[in-house]
Amino acid sequence: MKIIVVFFGRGKNTSRALRQRKARRSSLSEHSSYQGATVPIIESIDVCAAVVPLDKVTSFSNRTVSTRHYGLVKVRSTDGVEGIGFCYVGSAGGAIFEAAVQSLLGPVLLGKDSHAVEGLWQSMYQEALLQGRQGTVMRALSALDIALWDLNAKTAGLPLHKFLGAMELETVPAYASGGYYLDGKTPQHLGEEMASYVDKGFRAVKMKTGRLSPREEEARLKAAREAVGPDVELMMDCNNAWQDVTQAMQYIRRFEQYEPYFIEEPFGPDDIDSHAKLARLTHLPIATAEIGYGRWYHKELLDKGAAGILQTDAAVCGGITEWKRIAATAASYGVVVCPHWFHDVHAPLVAATPNARYVEFFWDDQVLNFRKLVDRQLTHKQGRVVLHQEPGLGFGFDERMVERYGKWTRVAR
């Protein structure tokens, strides 16, 4: 009997495969060594309420502002990386923000891995169930969440828009925001202001409305439209001016012929049904949610058809973590997002969000005087905001200016 023994697997191809398997095992071994590497543990949090006066007293449709309170935080990890976060508290109430960070939310983060963003968000939200879910406590949560994203993007060595997964890499579309009420400001002055933004390259601009009578507001809108021409998107911000749908329609009927891009915040934020009724009575898109907290509020807006455009603010709604959830939900309803205020944080979010349309851009620090507190400004080019390319948000606080308007307090273990 003849026995034939055949040997397999010793050719060139098999040798190559063995080398590849060894290389993979080596690579896995290297990756597994991360368990012994430094993990970014949150070591300390600094909090400050900065009280910054406006250069000129400025009016909206239903209130006048002379001072702004900003909530600032710095979250530092054991590897020496620092992330910053911030929010607008209001014309008062900075002390509430500081207390929320020091006593309620900050201690939740200390000693934790900064990468656990979803879990940390849930822990902070749970801790604030009795005191928060809206208002200043939710804004404090938002600021801390923003700081975590900034910290983690810096740790990864990526600008925030790339860390999030960018749609746009260099610039994002923006509209110039202004048109506030000032003593002695005429419709002609308003028109000149709007035209000046177009001269700077913006193809979309926004003005305030709702403070004056329907006839007077129509005159302001007419002057603005004639100044910018028919091809520039012209937005109108009511700042919750109207009390009911009947009153709103007295204005809207006069506005429709000038084709504004949207009507913003016609009613108070909690009057969702009136937003929905107005949306059914006019072809003009209704924009709202800049003071909206949490995904559940936004879902009700969407379910009732109360918003054609969401203006969700990451420094209000629950931070970048919650903003991303809300934007994704809006996309499933076919609704676009044009986030409110704070172009410094919203530019990278718009860059990473398919259904985000515009960044609201303030070209000076008269109204958004938060600009005085940061060490580097976003720039614009041909109506688009130029994204920072440095890791994280791409800027920090101007400590000299922060010291002028507030004082840091440290929260540590």
Model-derived segments and spans:
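Polybasic, lysine-rich low-complexity intrinsically disordered segments
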Residues: 2-3, 12-13, 22
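Low-complexity, intrinsically disordered or signal/transmembrane-proximal segments
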Residues: 20, 31-35
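Structured beta-strand/loop patches that form or line metal/cofactor-binding pockets in enzymes
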Residues: 38-84, 88-90, 366, 371
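Conserved, mostly hydrophobic/aromatic
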Residues: 42, 80, 144, 157, ...
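Metal- or metallocofactor-binding catalytic centers and their adjacent structured scaffolds
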Residues: 44, 76-155
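Shared catalytic-loop signature of beta/alpha-barrel
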Residues: 103, 253, 259, 270-384, ...
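Metal-dependent enolase-superfamily TIM-barrel catalytic cores that perform enediolate-based chemistry
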Residues: 165-282
